[in-house]
Swiss-Prot record:
Catalytic activity: carbamoyl phosphate + L-aspartate = N-carbamoyl-L-aspartate + phosphate + H(+)
One of the record's GO cellular component terms: cytosol
Pathway(s) annotated for this protein in UniProt: Pyrimidine metabolism; UMP biosynthesis via de novo pathway; (S)-dihydroorotate from bicarbonate: step 2/3
SUPFAM superfamilies for this protein: Aspartate/ornithine carbamoyltransferase
PROSITE patterns on file: CARBAMOYLTRANSFERASE
Name the UniProt record assigns to this protein: Aspartate carbamoyltransferase catalytic subunit
Record InterPro entries: Asp/Orn_carbamoyltranf_P-bd, Asp/Orn_carbamoylTrfase, Asp/Orn_carbamoylTrfase_sf, Asp_carbamoyltransf, Asp_carbamoyltransf_Asp/Orn-bd
Residues bound to carbamoyl phosphate: 59-60, 109, 142, 145, 294-295
EC nos: 2.1.3.2
Family to which the UniProt record says this protein belongs: Belongs to the aspartate/ornithine carbamoyltransferase superfamily. ATCase family.
Gene3D superfamilies assigned: Aspartate/ornithine carbamoyltransferase
Annotated keywords: Pyrimidine biosynthesis, Transferase
Length: 339
């Protein structure tokens, strides 16, 4: 763990191959703890972790809460409905309140892009010993989801020893609303870092052509890419072409709440063209796993029958793997906290 240099986890674009290896190794260990009878480690005993979710969440917030408790941390959950935001307090003042209370790690989800990054910059400038963990910001990033998806796939391809090598030269297809998906962006960084070839598929309104260059250059303000050679990214408009020879398929929810008018004609047409079903999976020419980060819109991006077919979909595995993955991140951020 001596190679871990991050005081915050904001975006997977900054992760080196060693960072991915560290997280996958720790996640494997913590998964055994999560499944054991004791289910707890004293690693973060006495540390305060605050979950500040300014957007609705079920899986991610609960997963972070359980992860923190598995590490014996004290946990404080923020609720918008019962907060002083209703009295006119700004989100920044709410967050600063938790910092003043001595929170060691703030897990933050916000509808606006870069809120976690701006907060990380604030605590660094003011020499505050608090780490920021991005639990999803706007369209930008959802690093813990990208990492748990990476672990889920690595475990599927190599159950005995999941690692970054488990993804090397694998063909992963991501289908759906790429434009509005922070999950897709985080998966692009993670999968290509580990040598996977990623094919994106969706209508032009939800998958602009510029996504083909998404991982070619670091984000604004980042001087270099810590990955020497990434896997390739392709765009296919035809689902049949995209699924050909795929080793795994991820389908994404249509984020209607983020869409402008007329971005889609109708949901029935979308399902016919891009819905993942048992029939469309035959284009892969072999049995492949299907992932979905949730929440699922049955009969829109994935068939009801496929959602309930646990011999093919890894949806429950993704939820299960979320806890040890987030344990790994919290543990790494909590390692160097001063008493």
């Amino acid at each position: 763990m001596n190679n871990w240099k991050h005081n915050h986890v904001l975006d997977l674009s900054t992760f080196s191959l060693e960072d991915y290896k560290t997280v996958l190794e720790l996640t494997t260990r913590f998964k055994d703890v999560h499944k054991s009878s004791s289910r707890k480690l004293p690693a973060l005993h006495g540390r305060l972790i605050a979950n500040l979710f300014f957007e609705p969440s079920t899986r991610t917030r609960t997963s972070f809460e359980l992860a923190a408790k598995r590490l014996s941390a004290d946990v404080q959950n923020f609720s918008v409905s019962s907060s002083s935001l209703n009295k006119g307090e700004t989100p920044l003042d709410t967050i600063l309140t938790y910092i003043s209370m001595g929170a060691d790690i703030l897990v933050i989800r916000h509808e606006s892009t870069n809120v976690p990054a701006e907060l990380a910059n604030y605590v660094d400038i003011n020499n505050i010993n608090t780490s920021i963990l991005n639990a999803g910001d706007g369209f930008h990033s959802h690093p813990s989801q990208g990492l748990l998806d990476l672990f889920t796939l690595a475990t599927f391809f190599n159950p005995n020893e999941p690692s970054t090598n488990s993804l090397l030269n694998k063909k992963i297809t991501i289908v759906g609303d790429i434009l509005h998906s922070r999950v897709a962006r985080s998966n692009l960084w993670a999968l290509t870092a580990c040598g996977a070839e990623v094919t994106l598929c969706g209508p032009p309104s939800l998958l602009p052509e510029e996504f083909i260059d998404f991982v070619q250059n670091p984000p604004l303000g980042q001087n270099f890419d810590p990955i020497n050679k990434r896997g390739s990214v392709f765009i296919k408009r035809s689902l049949k072409d995209a699924l050909k020879n795929s080793d795994a398929v991820m389908t994404l929810r249509l984020q209607k709440e983020r869409m402008k008018q007329n971005m889609l004609t109708d949901l029935d047409s979308y399902y016919v063209q891009y819905g993942i079903t048992h029939e469309s999976l035959k284009w892969c020419e072999k049995k492949v796993p299907v992932l979905h980060p949730g929440p699922v819109n049955r009969g829109v991006e994935i068939s009801n029958r496929l959602v309930e077919d646990n011999s093919i979909n890894l949806i429950s595995k993704q939820v299960e793997n979320g806890i040890p993955t987030r344990m790994a991140l919290l543990y790494l951020l909590g390692l160097n906290k001063k008493d």
